């Protein structure tokens, strides 16, 4: 099997905000369903604070690789890594062992910033709002990533805002 693609999955506001006080600054049930569909069965890389923000236990059906310089988390379905590079290496091994073609990056802000140079694909939920927050996603450089798909999604009854699902693919060197 070839090397699995590195896929970032993120929801961000129009002003690039992705978090506030260790949580997402919106409720988007529709987007959570999309996140599950995109990541199910695939290794999920996230930082320790993000892991704690999703309940401190693995999301079902996805092997987790948690990046932490200090805390050790010992539980089934969770591997630990001291750096993003180590986490990506472990997640790639898991992907190859389990026969999946993607490794998913699920945040938070620092992990996204470090992972962007390695990413092949970005699955971005653009939240049609500007919100206050303390964590932002880096600018997506159109010279590096081409938007290959965008779908408007009206706000459902359990969503604070309408969104647009976009897929960006890394441009290949000419």
Give a label for each model feature.
Residues 2-174:
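Enzymes that bind and transform nitrogen-containing heteroaromatic metabolites
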